[in-house]
A protein has these predicted regions:
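Catalytic centers of hydrolytic enzymes
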Residues: 22-30, 34, 39-49, 53-68, ...
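Bacterial Sec-dependent N-terminal signal peptides
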Residues: 1-25
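Acidic, metal/ion-coordinating pockets
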Residues: 21-320, 360-372, 382
Length: 588
């Protein structure tokens, strides 16, 4: 009997153990995110003509290594802003538009599992992004990118803009994952309606709430991820939406396990407690594929249900990874064609120009753009900001690559009607972001922020440098001893005529600014957002770089010089202060 009892006990124990093994298991998943690639596919800077660190060709080496470790348990996602940046995407978008889009081919080659649309994927215009959407093979996500007539409607996949999906579904080792993609709804503040005709952009918190509910009811997933082309917080905030709403969604919309995000070109890897007291990982790799964002998820599953989730977020630097030579060989013809394109000769400069000089007063770089804007539009006044932190165009032959350094974005060129007072207030708003109020000769002249030196859009300043507008066509002084809102004194028109704050002027600017970008026209000049369209006198049908290029071609030889139409005062204080700030920013 004892022997039988022992045998029976052993058999029962073995049966229970086998059942436990069958009903309980651990699954490990890995997710890798890229974001704000901006055409940084290959390890070559087509603008500067030199090697690049990072880029997708290096990231792909790391990704393939992780795929070998993880097998099918790896999810690769991209967070948008891929269609504008390096000249290779401009070449694909506009020079050879009949061919399959290069960005689509790169996404397909790397076998991404999902992609969210970014604002710089909308800016190239319907012809470009509609074709790109058709050519990308993985799900393209945009839960808040809806057909015009469907804004703020129910959660219905039929309401989403043609070719996009609100979310994607992925099964990994029996685990069901849903990825919700959203785009910052601030597009109308930057882009003319013609660029996004037929589309509306919903506020993110409300949109996330309805789609989480829909997914929980219809998909019953084990994990819900966000893939948001929207920064952590801040930016443009209106009564209708917040530009950077990732933190708000993480806090206010229960259901998310992880939110992968981007748009703000900053590294983030942190936890946020939502309104139910649960922790949500939010993670952002920043831009240009210097890093990837990685999440490792270990799930304990019992009886087919997830009973525990361990999540770890990591920012992985890929700047010095080995280049994926197979990927390079696959795209070598494209690389050679882009090099030939950017090598085209446009004209000749008799002297070099430097963007860095734009932060300290009149500069030949910024004033060349001002002068060309006035030539093209015949406006009275030009407004523009430095679009690069530290670029140089050397004297001698000017190539197409130099034109991308001169003007980095595919903005259109606009002319608006503005009163003299609005012009002054616009400039006040700009210089308030740009400069400090000095109370002693030892103060900073510029509004600097040590914490932003690694931020690719602030680069050591407190505010975005692409909002530092100066003006041409008027002579003025900026007094750094005056308080905000009282620094700018306009002396006269540059042609010698009086400047009148009550008079209407024709003012040239780019499309980003003309549509309210940076809020200089709205918060600064005081023009209501819904009145901006009525102020438009003229706009180009092609990007500004195209017209700047054509003007330089016509001129042949250009001798760029500062206009000397404005300056910082009092000079006894600001000159030494600017030199100190120059050393802090540039080291010399």
């Amino acid at each position: 009997m004892r022997r039988v009892f022992l045998s029976t006990f052993f058999a029962a124990t073995l049966t229970l153990s086998v059942q436990a093994q069958q009903t309980s298991k651990t699954v490990t998943l890995k997710v890798i995110e890229t974001s704000d690639v901006h055409g940084h596919f290959f390890p070559w800077d087509f603008m500067e003509g030199r090697p690049l660190k990072g880029t997708l060709t290096r990231a792909n080496t790391y990704i393939n290594r992780e795929r070998q470790k993880c097998g099918d348990n790896l999810l690769l996602i991209d967070n948008g802003d891929i269609l504008q940046g390096q000249p290779c995407v401009y070449w694909s978008n506009y020079v050879i538009p009949e061919d399959e889009n290069l960005a689509a081919r790169v996404i397909n080659y790397m076998q991404y599992d999902a992609e969210t649309v970014g604002n710089h994927d909308i800016e190239p215009g319907h012809k470009v992004y509609d074709k790109w959407i058709r050519e990308v093979r993985c799900p393209l996500l945009g839960a808040n990118i809806v057909k015009e007539e469907c804004k703020d409607g129910e959660a219905d996949p039929e309401n989403i803009y043609t070719g996009l999906q609100p979310y994607s579904v992925h099964i990994k080792d029996g685990v069901k994952i849903c990825v919700i993609g959203m785009l910052t709804p601030a597009i109308p503040n930057w882009l003319n309606k013609s660029i996004w005709k037929g589309i509306e952009f919903e506020e993110m918190v409300g949109c996330a709430r309805k789609w989480v509910k829909y997914i929980q009811e219809n998909e019953q997933p084990d994990l819900i991820f966000g893939l948001f082309h929207s920064g952590k917080d801040g930016g443009i905030v209106t009564t209708d939406y917040e530009e950077n709403a990732t933190a708000a969604v993480a806090r206010e919309v229960p259901g998310f396990d992880i939110i992968f995000f981007g748009h703000d070109h900053q590294v983030h890897n942190e936890w946020i407690t939502n309104i139910e007291g649960k922790q949500v990982l939010i993670i952002d790799p920043s831009c240009w594929v210097r890093n990837v964002a990685e999440a490792e998820i270990e799930l304990t599953i019992q009886d087919g249900k997830v009973v525990n989730k361990d999540i770890k977020g990591t920012i992985v630097n890929v700047e010095d990874e080995q280049i994926d030579e197979q990927m390079m060989a696959h795209f070598q013809k494209d690389i050679d064609a882009v090099k030939a394109y950017v090598g085209q000769k446009i004209g000749r400069f008799e002297s070099p120009i430097y963007t860095r000089e734009s932060f300290f007063g009149n500069s030949a770089f910024t004033d060349l753009i001002h002068n060309l804007q006035l030539q093209i539009t015949h406006a009275d006044i030009s407004l523009t900001a430095p679009l690069a932190f530290n670029s140089t165009i050397k004297e001698g032959e000017v190539t197409m690559a130099d034109m991308f350094k001169l003007y980095r974005f595919e903005n259109l060129l606009f002319t608006l009607r503005m009163t003299g007072e609005e012009v002054r207030k616009h400039l006040e708003y700009s210089y308030d972001m740009w400069t400090n109020t000095m109370t002693s000769p030892d103060d900073h002249a510029l509004r600097l922020n040590d914490d932003s030196k690694d931020d690719q859009q602030r680069t050591g300043f407190q505010y975005y440098t692409f909002n530092f507008d100066s003006a041409c066509g008027i002579d003025y002084e900026v007094d750094l001893t005056k308080p905000d809102g009282q620094k700018v004194k306009i002396l006269r028109m540059s042609n010698g005529e009086p400047f009148d704050e009550k008079k209407w002027y024709k003012v040239a600017m780019n499309s980003y600014r003309a549509n309210g970008g940076g809020e200089l026209l709205t918060q600064g000049a005081g023009i209501p957002k819904d009145s901006l369209d009525a102020r438009v006198i003229f706009h180009t049908d092609r990007d500004q770089r195209h017209f700047l290029t054509e003007e330089i071609r016509k001129m042949g030889t250009v001798n760029p010089k500062p206009n000397h139409n404005w300056k910082f005062v009092p000079e006894a204080w600001v000159k030494p202060a600017l030199e100190r700030d120059r050393k802090l920013l540039f080291g010399n």
